[in-house]
Every structure is written in C-alpha cells, then in structure tokens.
UniProtKB/Swiss-Prot annotation:
EC number: 6.3.5.-
NCBIfam families per record: gatB (TIGR00133), PRK05477.1-2 (NF004012), PRK05477.1-4 (NF004014), PRK05477.1-5 (NF004015)
Keyword Kinase part of the UniProt annotation: no
Keywords attached to this entry: ATP-binding, Ligase, Nucleotide-binding, Protein biosynthesis
Keyword check for Metal-binding: no
Gene Ontology process terms (BP): glutaminyl-tRNAGln biosynthesis via transamidation; translation
Official protein name in the record: Aspartyl/glutamyl-tRNA(Asn/Gln) amidotransferase subunit B
Catalytic activity: L-glutamyl-tRNA(Gln) + L-glutamine + ATP + H2O = L-glutaminyl-tRNA(Gln) + L-glutamate + ADP + phosphate + H(+); L-aspartyl-tRNA(Asn) + L-glutamine + ATP + H2O = L-asparaginyl-tRNA(Asn) + L-glutamate + ADP + phosphate + 2 H(+)
PROSITE patterns: GATB
GO molecular function: asparaginyl-tRNA synthase (glutamine-hydrolyzing) activity; ATP binding; glutaminyl-tRNA synthase (glutamine-hydrolyzing) activity
Stated family: Belongs to the GatB/GatE family. GatB subfamily.
Length: 475
C-alpha cells in the first residue's frame, strides 16, 4: 500500500544574548544547577518580567532573511500548562501576534531537486527549565538555569515529504541562524533543538493524525527518528489500528521512539495576552535599520563565489558552510588575490588539520593572514608547493609565520639556473643507463630524473626550472 508522508518542523533556536528574555540572569552554559535562576525564573510571586530588548532585532533579522512579514504589533501571551520544570505554571510565548508572521520561504536541495519550504511563523518565547532523570534514581531533579532563556521558535509549513527533506530544511535553518549571528547553533548544548511533526495518509485523502518527536539534537537522529516514526505509523494503520495524537521521545541508544504524553491542541493551553508585558510596536524605520545591518546570506554568497571567483558549485558550498569559514576564506583572498589557490588551501590542508584536531575554523592556530603569507611565498617562488606543506605544518605547530619558518629552516627554493644545472648534470651522470633508456624511447624515465633532482635538492629546486633544464639536456 502506498503512503504519503507529511512532515512539519518546529525549531527552537536559543538567541545569543547575555541574559534571559525577561530577567537579568545569565544564560552561560554549564553553570552549577540552579545558580543562574533569580526569583522571576523560580516563579516567586510579585516578580514582574522586563523584556530584554536585544531579542527583538535578532528575531526581525530572521524574518527579513526568510522574506517573511514582520509583525508591526507583537504581543506576548501566557501559555498555561503544568510541568515540574515550569514553576510559574505558564510559559510566556507569542500566539496570535508573533514577531515574524507569514510568507517566509526556505529553499532546500535533495537528490538534485530544489524545493521550497514555507515558514508559517517565528515567535519569541522563554525556555523552560530542565528535568534531570539520571542523577537521582527513582526521582527527578529540576535545574532552572535554562528557565527564561530566550528562544525563537521557527514553525514550518507541513511541506516536507521525507526524512531527507526534513534534515535538509533543518540544516538550512541551522546555517541561516548562525550566519545571522542570532544563535550559535550548538546542538549538543541544546541551543538548536528540533521537534518533528509526522503523519501519513493515502494520496488523495486528508492528512493523517500527527505525532510529535520532541527535542532531537542531531541531524543524524532527526533522520533516524522520522524514519522510525513513519515505519511505526504504517505498521499501526496497516494492522487496523489508529495513530494517536501524541508526543514521542526518540531513544538514540535503543533506536526507537516511545510515547511521552498525549499531544495538546492550542486551546488546551488557554492562551491569553500577558498582562505584565506591553505589546512591542515595530516601525518601518526599525526594520530598515536592521536590514542595513544584515550580512550577506549563504545562498547569495555561494552564487557570488561561482560568478566572481570562478569556483565550482561544490567548492562554493564548502567554503560557505559556515560564516566563520567564509570570512576566513575571503580574508585570505583579499590578501593574495588568488581565489582558487586560496580555496584549495582552505579546503585541503587547513580543513584536514581542523578535522584531525576536532576544532572549528575560529579556533585555528593558523590565521587567515598566516595562510595568505604562505600562499604569497608560493606565488613569488620563494618556496615550492611541496615545501609549502612542510611550512604549513610548522605554522600549525606554532613555530611562527611562513617567513620565519622558511628562514629558520633554510627552505627557500633554489632558482639559480647554474645551481639547478649542476644538480641535473650530477643526476644524469650517475644514471647513465636510465639516460640511454630514455633516449631509446622510454619517456616515462623523465619523471625518474625529475624525482632524483628534487631528492638531491631536498625538494627545494624550482620544479619548472628542473623540467626545462632536463628537457634541454636530454634532447
């Protein structure tokens, strides 16, 4: 039996502020439990919220990047429910008047096909605390450090039809919030969490009952969880059962989803405007001022790299994979004026070293200026490409700049024609049999001679000059 899959995602992006959305408590990750929660976060009576104004432009930036309508009058609402990590008994969120309204679109590419995914809305809200189950056998601990952390919840249309499409959309949104500088995207620390709403139905029939997969924190797990949920729903329906509207948790260790609770509808939360917070009024001048601060978006940057730098689509996509990577690459190009050579070094030796050490490019011991300095020494024939890799290793190990390492280790390329000719003469004199073989038609011996000259010069002879002198001598 053929089933059609329908998927919508709700992404919770933690905004990069110093303090919480309605209180002055810090949002630094990793503090001891309950050390970053003040009286408001604890739900104590008589405490009033004060909006952290820094969250407003961050939300508007996302709306502009998506091409969505910005809510000119944005209202905060109380979302009422009881859970141990929500001591107030309600979450301050947005319902009827979100800061980012309809019209947003994200383009994804899956299996070579471009697809547009609609974004329903994005609204501001406070995060809840965290329930800790493992540390207390038979009990649950509550850490309220996270309570009140500013979130932007980004809600997609149910436009995705496979787990692959859902992952592509999540990755695109992950890239976007990092480029905008509004979220650090750290999934391990919970800065970027994804809820997946999954249903199935027969083509031509209404959408089926959806189940929500909660708080998945890696792209791999998103795909696995959705695939499992699709299989589960098919099995339920084909065995004559009914899919229940519920929230389910994905267990990565057991690779299964399990029921957490029945899924609520909006009216179950009894939303009403928060009486303690005034509506936020956003003017055209506010929007234009924020638009002027917007960075170049990744899709536009990729197109520019292909058009202006002559890079391939693959290289452009790799180099724009993160804003930090793109900024590093552009800093190297600005100094060397060699886009393709710079791209090769960033994608090659630099990325290999970053991966081996497991660090981000922002933590690279080789700065963009240092890499540019190395490329300049290749360009002016101070060193060969082969020696350059040795110099890069020295730079990575903290031995200094390219110029310092070249000087300290005596790595300057031999370009003196008489010195190269002497090296060639020695190699040919010591390999008379190979010379005869070459002259007898074994042209592959030419590579042998080049290798011997480079070996004799410890890799420092200019390869182009070596080739030319050998050709002249072997005529």
């Amino acid at each position: 039996m053929t089933w059609e899959v329908v998927i919508g995602l709700e992404i919770h992006a933690q905004l990069t502020t110093k303090t919480k959305i309605f209180s002055g408590s810090s949002i630094d990750y990793g503090a001891a439990p309950n050390t970053q929660a003040n009286l408001l976060d604890l739900g104590m009576p008589g405490q009033l919220p004060v909006l952290n104004k820094a969250v407003i432009p961050k939300a508007i930036k996302l709306g502009l990047a998506l091409g969505a309508k910005i809510g000119r009058r944005s209202v905060f609402d109380r979302k009422n429910y009881f859970y141990p990590d929500l001591p107030k008994g309600y979450q301050t969120s947005q319902f009827s008047f979100p800061i980012v309204d309809t019209g947003g679109v994200v383009e994804i590419e899956v299996d070579g096909e471009i697809k547009k995914i609609g974004v329903t809305r994005a609204h501001l809200e406070e995060d809840a605390g965290k329930s800790i189950h493992d540390a207390f056998p038979g009990q649950t601990g509550i850490d309220l450090n996270r309570a009140g952390t500013p979130l932007l919840e980004i809600v997609s249309e149910p436009d995705m039809r496979s787990a692959k499409e859902a992952v592509a959309y999540a990755k695109k949104m992950h890239e976007l919030v990092q480029y905008l500088g509004i979220c650090d995207g750290n999934m391990q620390e919970g800065s970027f969490r994804v809820d997946s709403n999954v249903s199935i139905h027969k083509p031509g029939t209404p959408f089926g009952t959806r189940a929500e997969l909660k708080n998945i924190n890696s792209f791999k797990f998103i795909e696995q969880a959705i695939e499992l949920e699709i299989e589960r729903q098919i099995e339920v329906l084909e065995s004559g059962g009914k899919v229940v509207q519920e929230t389910r948790l994905y267990d990565a260790d057991k690779n299964e989803t399990r029921s957490m609770r029945e899924k609520e509808e909006a009216n179950d939360y009894r939303y009403f405007p928060c009486p303690d917070l005034l509506p936020v009024v956003i003017t055209e001048e506010d929007i234009e001022a924020i638009r002027a601060e917007m960075p170049e978006m990744p899709d536009a940057k990729r197109k520019r790299y292909v058009a202006d730098f002559g890079l391939s689509d693959y290289d452009a996509a790799f180099l724009t994979g993160s804003r930090a990577m793109a900024e590093y690459f552009e800093a190297v190009v600005a100094k060397t004026n060699e886009a393709k050579v710079s791209a090769n070094w960033v994608m090659g030796e630099l990325s290999k070293s970053l991966n081996q050490k497991g660090i981000d490019i922002s933590e690279s011991p080789v700065s963009a200026d240092m890499l540019a300095g190395l490329i300049e020494r290749i360009q002016d024939n101070t060193i060969s490409g082969k020696i350059a890799k040795q110099v890069f290793d020295g730079m990575w190990s903290g031995e200094g700049s390219a110029d310092e390492i070249i000087e300290q280790k005596g790595l300057k390329q031999i370009t003196d024609s008489s010195a190269i000719e002497a090296l060639v003469n020695d190699v040919l004199a010591n390999n008379a049999a190979q010379v005869e073989a070459y002259k007898g038609g074994q042209e592959k011996m030419f590579g042998f001679f080049v290798g011997q000259v480079m070996k004799a010069s410890q890799g420092q002879a200019n390869p182009a000059q070596v080739n030319q002198v050998l050709k002249d001598k072997l005529k």
